[in-house]
Amino acid sequence: MSFDAHDWENVYLQTAPAALPWNAGGPDPDLARLVKAGTIPVGQALDIGTGPGHDAVFLIQHGFNVIGIDISPTAVTLARENASNAGLFGFFQQGDIRQIPVEDHFIDFTNDRGCFHVLEPPDRPQAVDEIHRVLKPRGLFLLRVFSDKEPGTDGPYRFTRQELDDLFRGKFTTLQFWEGEFAGPRKPKSYSMLMEKK
Protein backbone atom coordinates (compact mmCIF):
# COMPACT_ATOMS: atom_id res chain seq x y z
CA MET A 1 0.00 0.00 0.00
CA SER A 2 1.38 3.39 -0.99
CA PHE A 3 2.07 6.24 1.42
CA ASP A 4 2.10 8.88 -1.30
CA ALA A 5 0.33 12.13 -0.41
CA HIS A 6 -1.23 12.38 -3.88
CA ASP A 7 -2.71 8.86 -3.60
CA TRP A 8 -4.29 9.56 -0.22
CA GLU A 9 -5.64 12.91 -1.37
CA ASN A 10 -7.31 11.17 -4.32
CA VAL A 11 -8.95 8.68 -1.95
CA TYR A 12 -10.47 11.52 0.06
CA LEU A 13 -11.53 13.43 -3.06
CA GLN A 14 -13.17 10.39 -4.66
CA THR A 15 -14.82 8.78 -1.61
CA ALA A 16 -17.65 10.12 0.52
CA PRO A 17 -16.48 10.38 4.15
CA ALA A 18 -19.06 7.85 5.38
CA ALA A 19 -17.80 5.32 2.80
CA LEU A 20 -14.15 5.46 3.87
CA PRO A 21 -13.31 1.97 5.20
CA TRP A 22 -11.47 3.42 8.22
CA ASN A 23 -14.28 5.81 9.13
CA ALA A 24 -15.90 4.18 12.16
CA GLY A 25 -18.27 7.11 12.66
CA GLY A 26 -16.95 7.79 16.14
CA PRO A 27 -13.90 7.43 18.37
CA ASP A 28 -11.99 4.18 18.61
CA PRO A 29 -13.51 2.13 21.46
CA ASP A 30 -10.12 1.21 22.93
CA LEU A 31 -9.03 4.85 22.97
CA ALA A 32 -12.29 5.80 24.68
CA ARG A 33 -11.89 3.03 27.27
CA LEU A 34 -8.32 4.00 28.15
CA VAL A 35 -9.08 7.71 28.41
CA LYS A 36 -12.21 7.21 30.50
CA ALA A 37 -10.31 4.87 32.84
CA GLY A 38 -7.60 7.51 33.35
CA THR A 39 -4.94 5.20 31.89
CA ILE A 40 -4.14 7.96 29.41
CA PRO A 41 -3.98 11.22 31.42
CA VAL A 42 -5.19 14.50 29.94
CA GLY A 43 -2.46 16.52 28.25
CA GLN A 44 -1.09 17.54 24.86
CA ALA A 45 -2.13 14.92 22.30
CA LEU A 46 -1.06 14.15 18.75
CA ASP A 47 -3.47 12.27 16.49
CA ILE A 48 -1.51 10.78 13.59
CA GLY A 49 -3.50 10.06 10.42
CA THR A 50 -6.42 11.94 11.91
CA GLY A 51 -8.70 11.28 8.91
CA PRO A 52 -12.24 12.49 9.69
CA GLY A 53 -11.02 13.48 13.16
CA HIS A 54 -13.27 11.30 15.33
CA ASP A 55 -10.48 10.36 17.75
CA ALA A 56 -9.24 13.95 17.86
CA VAL A 57 -12.73 15.27 18.61
CA PHE A 58 -13.15 12.71 21.39
CA LEU A 59 -9.83 13.74 22.93
CA ILE A 60 -10.74 17.44 22.79
CA GLN A 61 -14.09 16.66 24.45
CA HIS A 62 -12.18 14.99 27.27
CA GLY A 63 -9.89 17.92 27.97
CA PHE A 64 -6.89 17.24 25.72
CA ASN A 65 -5.18 19.89 23.62
CA VAL A 66 -4.98 18.17 20.24
CA ILE A 67 -2.80 18.42 17.16
CA GLY A 68 -4.22 16.31 14.35
CA ILE A 69 -2.11 15.56 11.28
CA ASP A 70 -2.92 13.80 8.04
CA ILE A 71 -1.06 13.53 4.77
CA SER A 72 -4.25 14.47 2.88
CA PRO A 73 -5.27 18.16 2.90
CA THR A 74 -8.90 17.12 2.35
CA ALA A 75 -8.77 14.88 5.43
CA VAL A 76 -7.40 17.81 7.44
CA THR A 77 -10.28 20.01 6.28
CA LEU A 78 -12.79 17.28 7.15
CA ALA A 79 -11.35 16.84 10.65
CA ARG A 80 -11.34 20.59 11.23
CA GLU A 81 -14.98 20.82 10.10
CA ASN A 82 -16.03 17.91 12.33
CA ALA A 83 -14.40 19.56 15.34
CA SER A 84 -15.99 22.92 14.49
CA ASN A 85 -19.42 21.31 14.05
CA ALA A 86 -19.05 19.91 17.58
CA GLY A 87 -18.22 23.41 18.85
CA LEU A 88 -14.61 22.43 19.53
CA PHE A 89 -11.17 23.62 18.48
CA GLY A 90 -8.19 21.49 17.62
CA PHE A 91 -5.11 22.32 15.60
CA PHE A 92 -5.26 20.33 12.36
CA GLN A 93 -2.60 20.45 9.67
CA GLN A 94 -1.14 18.46 6.84
CA GLY A 95 1.69 16.29 8.11
CA ASP A 96 3.60 13.09 7.53
CA ILE A 97 4.35 10.46 10.19
CA ARG A 98 7.87 10.22 8.73
CA GLN A 99 8.51 13.92 9.41
CA ILE A 100 6.08 15.05 12.09
CA PRO A 101 5.64 18.86 12.12
CA VAL A 102 5.87 19.12 15.91
CA GLU A 103 8.77 20.26 18.09
CA ASP A 104 10.82 17.85 20.20
CA HIS A 105 9.42 16.57 23.51
CA PHE A 106 6.12 18.46 23.14
CA ILE A 107 3.53 15.66 23.23
CA ASP A 108 2.17 13.76 26.24
CA PHE A 109 0.16 11.23 24.23
CA THR A 110 0.31 10.10 20.61
CA ASN A 111 -2.57 8.22 18.99
CA ASP A 112 -2.27 6.18 15.78
CA ARG A 113 -5.37 4.31 14.69
CA GLY A 114 -4.16 2.85 11.42
CA CYS A 115 -1.49 5.10 9.93
CA PHE A 116 1.65 3.14 10.78
CA HIS A 117 0.41 -0.03 9.08
CA VAL A 118 0.32 1.59 5.63
CA LEU A 119 4.02 2.51 5.73
CA GLU A 120 6.46 0.65 3.52
CA PRO A 121 8.93 -1.39 5.60
CA PRO A 122 11.92 0.93 4.92
CA ASP A 123 9.94 3.92 6.28
CA ARG A 124 8.96 2.34 9.60
CA PRO A 125 12.15 3.01 11.64
CA GLN A 126 12.02 6.70 10.71
CA ALA A 127 8.38 6.88 11.85
CA VAL A 128 9.28 5.21 15.16
CA ASP A 129 12.09 7.75 15.63
CA GLU A 130 9.72 10.65 14.89
CA ILE A 131 7.06 9.47 17.33
CA HIS A 132 9.77 9.05 19.98
CA ARG A 133 11.21 12.50 19.21
CA VAL A 134 7.97 14.44 19.70
CA LEU A 135 6.93 12.66 22.91
CA LYS A 136 7.91 13.96 26.32
CA PRO A 137 9.88 11.61 28.58
CA ARG A 138 7.58 8.74 29.56
CA GLY A 139 4.99 9.96 27.05
CA LEU A 140 2.40 7.43 25.93
CA PHE A 141 1.77 6.01 22.46
CA LEU A 142 -1.33 4.04 21.46
CA LEU A 143 -0.88 2.06 18.24
CA ARG A 144 -3.42 -0.04 16.34
CA VAL A 145 -2.46 -2.05 13.25
CA PHE A 146 -3.79 -4.91 11.14
CA SER A 147 -2.70 -8.21 12.68
CA ASP A 148 -1.36 -11.27 10.89
CA LYS A 149 -4.67 -12.94 11.78
CA GLU A 150 -6.52 -10.75 9.26
CA PRO A 151 -6.90 -12.84 6.08
CA GLY A 152 -5.88 -11.61 2.66
CA THR A 153 -3.22 -9.20 1.51
CA ASP A 154 -5.24 -6.21 0.26
CA GLY A 155 -5.14 -2.94 2.17
CA PRO A 156 -2.67 -2.27 4.98
CA TYR A 157 0.27 -4.46 5.91
CA ARG A 158 -0.28 -7.19 8.49
CA PHE A 159 2.05 -7.42 11.50
CA THR A 160 3.09 -10.23 13.79
CA ARG A 161 3.56 -9.58 17.49
CA GLN A 162 7.27 -10.22 17.05
CA GLU A 163 7.57 -7.65 14.25
CA LEU A 164 5.96 -5.02 16.44
CA ASP A 165 8.19 -5.87 19.39
CA ASP A 166 11.27 -5.66 17.18
CA LEU A 167 10.26 -2.28 15.76
CA PHE A 168 9.48 -0.56 19.06
CA ARG A 169 11.47 -2.23 21.86
CA GLY A 170 14.52 0.02 21.47
CA LYS A 171 12.60 3.21 22.16
CA PHE A 172 9.40 2.16 23.93
CA THR A 173 8.25 -0.06 26.79
CA THR A 174 5.05 -1.98 26.08
CA LEU A 175 2.54 -1.41 28.90
CA GLN A 176 -0.39 -3.26 27.35
CA PHE A 177 -0.85 -5.49 24.30
CA TRP A 178 -4.14 -6.94 23.11
CA GLU A 179 -5.84 -8.50 20.13
CA GLY A 180 -9.10 -7.14 18.78
CA GLU A 181 -10.66 -5.67 15.70
CA PHE A 182 -10.98 -2.22 14.20
CA ALA A 183 -14.33 -0.52 14.65
CA GLY A 184 -16.15 0.10 11.39
CA PRO A 185 -18.01 -1.86 8.75
CA ARG A 186 -15.27 -4.37 7.89
CA LYS A 187 -13.95 -5.06 11.42
CA PRO A 188 -10.44 -6.24 10.41
CA LYS A 189 -8.44 -8.06 13.06
CA SER A 190 -5.98 -5.87 14.92
CA TYR A 191 -3.15 -5.73 17.40
CA SER A 192 -3.08 -2.79 19.79
CA MET A 193 -0.22 -1.61 21.95
CA LEU A 194 -0.06 1.04 24.64
CA MET A 195 3.58 2.03 24.99
CA GLU A 196 5.66 4.39 27.08
CA LYS A 197 8.66 6.30 25.75
CA LYS A 198 11.97 5.13 27.20
What are the functions of these language-model segments?
Residues 102-110:
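A short acidic, Gly/Pro-enriched loop at the edge of an enzyme's catalytic core
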Residues 55, 112-113:
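Conserved acidic functional residues
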Residues 114-118:
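Short catalytic micro-motifs in class I SAM-dependent methyltransferases
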Residues 1-102, 119-130, 134, 139-198:
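Class I (Rossmann-like) S-adenosyl-L-methionine-dependent methyltransferase catalytic domain
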Residues 111-112, 192:
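Polar/charged side chains located within well-ordered beta-strands of beta-rich proteins
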